[in-house]
Amino acid sequence: MIPSVYVETSVISYLTGRRNQRDLIVAAHQELTREWWDSRRQKFTLYASAVVIEEARRGNAALAQARMELIQELRLADVTPSARELANRLLLEAALPTKANADALHIAVAAVNGIDYLLTWNCSHLANAFMIPRVEKVCRVAGFEPPYICTPQELMED
């Protein structure tokens, strides 16, 4: 079976954004994201969701259009009542801060839809070594296997 990846909005933004000339870390993340997209994406079934679409529509109109075009290449995972309930549990049970509602939904949509990986550059609330164990616990207690949350760099193969 082909593994599945939920592509979170930060990855899509790094793929479609202008190359950052000022911040070397962001520039490196953009390059790693493009490398993963060009060399690895075909090894996975890729998903987004209505949450990704909502976030991708914000900001500069031309860049938003580019993000939306890229999202059209992905399958859409459903934002079900179960996903909304799990997102609320992630927020209420201190796995994520209350301001991270969209981040909780990304995790919940991936978990409820049985998606293997959640690909992100959001290291504050998602790909965060302190948050991941709490997220995993809440998902499992709710009866869902959590996605493996990682950056494009972590999902590369030699």
Language model features by range: what are they?
Residues M1-A48, R57-M68, L74, L92-T98, ...:
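Short, well-structured N-terminal submotif of metal-dependent ribonuclease cores
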Residues I12, V52-E55, A83-E85:
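Short, catalytically relevant binding-site loops at active-site mouths
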Residues W36-W37, A108-V109, C139:
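Short, flexible, glycine/charge-rich loop motifs used to bind or transfer phosphoryl groups or to couple energy/partner
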